[in-house]
From Swiss-Prot:
Pfam families: Proton_antipo_M. GO terms for cellular component: plasma membrane-derived thylakoid membrane. PANTHER family: NADH DEHYDROGENASE (PTHR22773). Belongs to the complex I subunit 2 family. The gene is ndhB. Keywords: Membrane, NAD, NADP, Plastoquinone, Quinone, Thylakoid, Translocase, Transmembrane, Transmembrane helix, Transport. This is NAD(P)H-quinone oxidoreductase subunit 2. It catalyses: a plastoquinone + NADH + (n+1) H(+)(in) = a plastoquinol + NAD(+) + n H(+)(out); a plastoquinone + NADPH + (n+1) H(+)(in) = a plastoquinol + NADP(+) + n H(+)(out). It is found in: Cellular thylakoid membrane. It comes from Parasynechococcus marenigrum (strain WH8102).
């Protein structure tokens, strides 16, 4: 990248020697990522001391690193916008919001994973370090403003995700999931690289801002081809139809805590990438990529929720559910308005709690029974009221039942879509929401309505509920926390929407895109 070298030489000439490092790196913008990186290194060092030492010290190290990252992100909120790595990373409020969702999803995923790792014989040090590496890549991806930083962040997240998917070495399903994820992910990376090379050839720069300016006057077939390649990569990352084929198999075969992270953290990073690159670079192709996203959203909402009806595995059901949920979030992208983008950010925050709450219940049931079949949940309320209540509330929220947090998240998305005349998306969203309520309530009915004699054999042999075993207390904290936010968060939806709206209104990228879209509409 010759232009970056020229820029660096110019910076060296203008800056005093003591100012050069700050000008080149500006570490304050990436301090949250630095906290995660230090926690990852400390975890690896502690792991060298042995499994017993790691089991004792890895959890507090992870809590400290992620907690510090969240505090630093809170301090960056509404602070002056700073860039880092010669402008390749931007720490605006939009990036802060998505990075906070990812860091919190990792923290909750770790809380629900310790007992699972202990019971399955998984080395906690390596597992936590790889998960922190995936978190680091996802957080950097949220603020990446250069094709090089986008690709490096994307690959950091992807490679760590492949390792996590296949971490259960003795489980054939886990190895199969990792292989499928690796093959499809490698193809997606190659497609993105080809699209990036076309963008670089058209603009002569790797900066997303410079590419966006160049494409304003270069709406050629080659530019349209690069849009297709980039959009395919984004669709793969958010598991949108028809780029979803990897999702059910990977979700079913991977360790459940890994699935919990992939369903939220990886998806949030994918939507952050979509905002940065589609909205930032392809403003001249606004109508084209929105049309493609409309098709993807309709297909995702329809196929994801309809196919989920036939699933017998809880993890596969939530895999198809996550495909449908991605379709709902895409409504906000297609709108391209302040309300649409804000509803998108809000729904990702809501999805964090209701989905991870559901996975916490699934992990707890799996730890106690070793089963993932939906039919084995029959009559569960008799033996474990906490799992029954928690899973019921989280599933109702995912279905959009009032007054749960998920209901208000969907309402904001549908209102934004209707105001922007996206009637097809709103109607399809409403219909598929009803479909999703059916399979969510089917699980709840099975847990609650069954008579004692109709309980599954698994539930009849259900072990005594004990929270004193190692790793169970963090799991209970995560479960109760997620369920509480899911149940009570609907009351606080207005402050949450204001938080999401601030992330959008203070983003120069989104405000410029909204202004250009409005101008084209008036023209």
């Amino acid at each position: 990248m010759p232009e970056m070298g020229v820029f660096l030489l110019a910076a060296q000439a203008m800056a005093a020697p003591g100012e050069l490092l700050n000008l080149s790196l500006n570490a304050t913008a990436v301090l949250p990522e630095g906290a995660v990186l230090l926690a990852m290194i400390a975890t690896l060092l502690v792991d060298l001391a042995g499994e017993k030492v790691a089991a004792r010290w890895v959890p507090p190290i992870c809590y400290g690193g992620l907690g510090t990252a969240l505090v630093l992100l809170a301090l960056q909120w509404n602070a002056p916008v700073e860039s880092s790595f010669l402008g390749a990373f931007l720490a605006d409020n939009l990036a802060v919001a998505f990075r906070a969702v990812i860091a919190l999803s990792t923290l909750l995923s770790l809380l629900i994973s310790w007992r699972y790792a202990e019971q399955s014989g998984t080395p906690v040090g390596e597992f936590a370090a790889i998960l922190l590496a995936a978190t680091l890549g996802a957080m950097l991806l949220c603020g990446a403003t250069d094709l090089v930083s986008v690709f490096i962040s994307l690959e950091t997240l992807s490679v760590a995700s492949y390792l996590l998917s296949g971490y259960m070495k003795r489980d054939a399903r886990s190895s199969e999931a990792a292989l499928k994820y690796l093959l499809v992910g490698s193809a997606a990376a190659a497609v993105f690289l080809y699209g990036s090379s076309l963008l670089y050839g058209l603009s002569g720069s790797t900066s997303l801002e410079a590419i966006g300016v160049a494409l304003q006057t270069s709406t050629t077939p080659v530019a349209a081809l690069s849009l297709v390649f980039v959009l395919a990569t984004v669709a793969f990352k958010i598991a949108a139809v028809p780029f979803h084929q990897w999702t059910p198999d990977v979700y079913e075969g991977s360790p459940t805590p890994v699935v919990a992270f992939l369903s939220v953290g990886s998806k949030a990073a994918g939507f952050a990438l979509a905002l940065r690159i589609l909205v930032g670079c392809f403003g001249a192709f606004d109508g084209q990529w929105k049309l493609l996203f409309t098709v993807l959203a309709v297909l995702s909402m329809t196929l994801g929720n309809v196919v989920a009806l036939a699933q017998t595995s809880m993890k596969r059901m939530l895999a198809y559910s996550s495909i449908g949920q991605a379709g709902f979030v895409m409504i906000g992208m297609v709108c391209g308005t302040e309300d649409g983008f804000a509803a998108m950010v809000l729904y990702m925050a809501a999805y964090l709690f209701m989905n991870l709450g559901a996975f916490a219940c699934i992990i707890l049931f799996s730890i106690r029974t070793g089963s993932d079949r939906i039919s084995d949940y029959a009559g569960l309320y008799q033996k474990d009221p906490l799992i029954t209540l928690g899973l019921s509330l989280c599933l109702l929220s995912l279905g959009g039942i009032p007054p749960m947090l998920g209901f208000f998240g969907k309402i904001y998305l549908f209102f934004a879509g209707w105001a922007d005349h996206q009637y097809l998306l709103v109607v399809v969203g409403l219909i598929t929401s009803v479909v999703s309520i059916y399979y969510y309530i089917s699980v709840i009915k099975m847990m609650v309505v069954k008579e004692p004699q109709e309980a599954s054999d698994i539930v009849k042999a259900y072990p005594d509920v004990s929270w004193s075993v190692m790793g169970m207390q963090p799991l209970r904290v995560a479960l109760i926390g997620c369920v509480a936010v899911t149940a009570v968060g609907g009351i606080l939806s207005n402050p949450l929407f204001q938080w999401a709206n601030t992330a959008v209104t203070s983003s120069p990228l989104l405000q410029e895109a909204i202004a250009q879209s409005t101008q084209r509409g008036l023209g």
